[in-house]
A protein has these predicted regions:
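Negatively charged, low-complexity tracts enriched in Asp/Glu with abundant Ser/Thr
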Residues: 1-36, 74-75
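Gram-negative host-targeted secretion-system effectors, predominantly Type III and Type IV
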Residues: 17, 46-50, 84-85
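Residue-level detector of beta-strand face positions
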Residues: 19, 41-43, 67
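A structural detector for beta-sheet-dominated domains
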Residues: 21-23, 30-32, 45, 57-59, ...
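A short, structured beta-strand/loop element
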Residues: 36-59
Length: 94
């Protein structure tokens, strides 16, 4: 859970929606619904094609757990995708 914690801790304070370029990727983060459901979304594009579509569960008063769900594969993130997402997110200037 170390990488999941690092990613969620880096993204939890983002308000609303942001989009930016980083390396060869366009990254779109949407935390606009975080107050309602304690979750956000990350979409990552490369060469105008969506390569990742994740949902993030942030901790709340009712539920302290965190998680990253791969919407494309309809299951929680696997280690390969987690390592790639970690590499992308942790090297941004957020």
């Amino acid at each position: 859970m170390g990488m999941v914690n690092e990613i969620t801790n880096k993204l939890i304070d983002i308000k609303g929606r942001i989009a930016f370029e980083h390396k060869d990727y366009i990254i779109y983060i949407d935390n606009s619904r975080k107050k309602e459901v304690d979750s956000g979304d990350i979409q990552i594009f490369k060469d105008r094609k969506q390569v990742y579509d994740f949902s993030i569960a942030y901790p709340s008063k009712e539920c302290k757990s965190k998680g990253i769900y791969n919407n494309t594969k309809d299951k929680f993130i696997n280690n390969i995708d987690l390592e790639k997402l970690h590499e992308i997110i942790m090297t941004t200037g957020l």
